[in-house]
UniProtKB/Swiss-Prot annotation:
Function: Catalyzes the reduction of hydroxylamine to form NH(3) and H(2)O.
UniProt-listed InterPro entries: HCP/CODH, Hydroxylam_reduct, Prismane-like_a/b-sand, Prismane-like_sf, Prismane_a-bundle
Location, primary (coarse class): cytoplasm
Cysteine persulfide modification, residue list: 407
Positions that bind [4Fe-4S] cluster: 3, 6, 15, 21
Keyword DNA damage: no
Catalyzed reactions per annotation: A + NH4(+) + H2O = hydroxylamine + AH2 + H(+)
Keyword match Metal-binding: yes
EC annotation from Swiss-Prot or TrEMBL: 1.7.99.1
Keywords: 4Fe-4S, Cytoplasm, Iron, Iron-sulfur, Metal-binding, Oxidoreductase
Protein name: Hydroxylamine reductase
Organism from which the protein derives: Thermosipho melanesiensis (strain DSM 12029 / CIP 104789 / BI429)
Length: 552
């Protein structure tokens, strides 16, 4: 195996024997094959589009397949093989539909040279799939800079795919996004592609990342209402309980409906914390609070929780034997020997009765005292405070906004973000989204004239809210350039959705981003130079030095 898609790449180079995340070599190689096959599917899907042939199932499958390969989503070789077999089926279907349309319109048989990813299929099962995955994986491209840019593009596409898939679950669609994902994948098959062409594609991916986040924002707010300022309890009550982690709000809503009147309290974990701010979800009285913190602490937090646990999307950490029997997966999440809740069929909700049954069998969890944290500062809510915020900026009460969105992770270096937040001057406000918030949302940083010094917009996809807020501030302050705002960026990344957010910021022209805790292993020195020269991206250094630079 060779994998370097997340911030935990072994020794800053890549994982070659087992992923730091827990991904095994067989799964890594199968995922590489699946990604390669999505490129082949995309080749035929784009050809078909030229001839007026569209297959919605094929188009969404490409996004779902990419999503399934994001860090900490799927650890199951069995599930990967199922994806691969389905990829072969759908590739043949869209290929056949294109060839028919081509022959009908052109009056001849299609005879262009076809990339291997659009044709290869041999019988031999999982062993052969693994071998092919090793052959067509990350290291296939020998030129370091071309490889770096192709992987940067692919990882951005994975993030876009994740956000788009979440929107599609809520019946909000955008064909242009899915077709761009396919375009990007097909372009990475080209052996003659240039650095300049790839840089252009990467920036275009940033634009589409904005579109994908906007689509998901519209889906979430249409379905669940605009987030409101909300206090969330972080303790637990002495009742049977279910803990929901991941990102899928519809899964949570369906579970809340199915647990009404059962005596079960439902708690959020990790990136599900923002669910409490949505009016349609907060009306459920048994949505009791948020237990625990960021994804990487789940091994201890899931064990301590004591109730049933539902994992709706990433980030799953390979579970301990001590609590494995009470962890359930659903959607694209995969881990062998965990009970999986099947997808919706015929428009019916998912059946969470196995989770509910387990929670009742386990009985009441311990009561734990907790504090309250304030969330709900998505763009609609912030726009209601905009006059107050503008007045604070103009009066000098707020000198800087510091965007500290992104991901959290297990490495000690991430304590930097807690210290950075603690040492920010009292005339600064943190804008955050994603699980990076857990490094500082428990700190008592106070407020500025009633404006909390930590404004939590929500999940990582709600980085879109931070963008909208920045653009509204730019307009209100009469500025021409987003970089003229009193906003600086200190972004923590972990996986591929954060890469999509980073590309979105670059597309919007944001300069001077500090990125940490480490730079991506897949960024070659020459590609890094392009990013530094064009966007002034820099790695974090020390808290003191970065405060000096960012607040100057």
């Amino acid at each position: 195996m060779f994998c370097y898609q997340c911030s935990e790449a072994s020794k800053g180079v890549g994982c070659t024997t087992i992923g730091v995340c827990g991904k095994t070599p067989d799964v890594a190689n199968l995922q590489d094959l699946l990604i390669w096959l999505t490129r082949g599917i995309s080749y035929w899907a784009l050809k078909a589009k030229e001839y007026g042939v569209k297959d919605d199932e094929v188009n969404l499958f490409v996004a779902e397949a990419l999503f399934s390969t994001i860090t900490n989503v799927n650890f199951s070789a069995k599930r990967m093989v199922e994806f691969i077999e389905r990829a072969f089926e759908l590739r043949e279907r869209i290929k056949h539909r294109f060839l028919e349309a081509y022959a009908e319109k052109e009056g001849k048989t299609f005879d262009e040279k076809v990339p291997e990813a659009a044709e290869w299929h041999k019988k031999g099962g999982v062993d052969l799939y693994e071998l092919k995955g090793m052959e067509v994986g990350v290291l296939f491209d020998k030129d370091e800079d071309i490889r770096s840019l192709k992987q940067l593009l692919i990882y951005g596409l994975k993030g876009i795919a994740a956000y788009t898939d979440h929107a599609y679950i809520l019946k909000h669609t955008n064909d242009d996004i899915l077709y761009f994902i396919q375009k990007g994948l097909v372009e990475t098959l080209r052996e003659d592609i240039t650095v300049d062409e790839l840089v252009s594609l990467v920036l275009e991916a940033g634009k589409v990342a904005v579109d994908a986040m906007a689509l998901l924002d519209k889906a979430n707010t249409t379905e669940f209402g605009n987030p409101e300022i909300t206090e969330v309890y972080t303790g637990t009550y002495n009742t049977p309980a279910i803990l929901v982690s991941g990102h899928d709000l519809l899964d949570l809503e369906e579970l809340l409906k199915q647990t009404e009147g059962t005596g079960i309290m439902v708690y959020t974990h990790g990136e599900m914390l923002p669910a409490h701010a949505y009016p349609k979800l907060k009306k459920y009285k048994h949505l009791a609070g948020n237990f625990g913190s960021a994804w990487w602490k789940q091994s201890e937090e899931f064990e301590e929780f004591g109730g049933a646990i539902l994992m709706t999307t990433n980030c799953l950490v390979p579970p301990k034997e001590s609590y494995k029997d009470r962890v359930f997966t659903t959607g694209l999440v995969g881990f062998d020997k965990l009970t999986h809740i099947p997808n919706r069929t015929d428009g019916k909700p998912k059946d969470f009765s196995p989770v509910i049954k387990k929670a009742l069998e386990l009985g009441p969890i311990p009561e734990r005292k907790g504090k309250k944290i304030v969330i709900g500062f998505a763009h609609d809510q912030v726009s209601r405070l905009l006059d107050k915020v503008i007045d604070a900026v103009k009066s000098g009460a707020i000198k800087k906004f510091v965007v500290m969105g992104g991901c959290d992770g297990r490495h000690k270096e991430r304590e930097y973000y807690t210290e950075f937040a603690k040492k920010l001057p009292k005339d600064t406000v943190i804008l955050t989204a994603g699980c990076a918030k857990y490094r500082y949302n428990h700190l008592d940083l106070g407020d500025i004239g009633g404006i909390p010094r930590v404004l939590d917009a929500g999940q990582c996809n709600d980085s879109y809210s931070l963008v909208v807020t920045a653009l509204k501030l730019k307009e209100a302050l009469g500025l021409d350039d987003i970089n003229d705002l009193p906003i600086v960026y200190n972004i923590a990344w972990y996986e591929q959705k954060a890469i999509a957010v980073l590309l979105a910021l670059l597309y919007l022209g944001v300069k001077g981003i500090r990125l940490g805790p480490v730079l991506p292993a897949f960024i070659s020195p020459n590609v890094l130079k392009v990013l530094v020269d064009k966007f002034n991206i820099a790695p974090i250094t020390t808290v003191e030095e970065d405060l000096k630079v960012l607040l100057s």
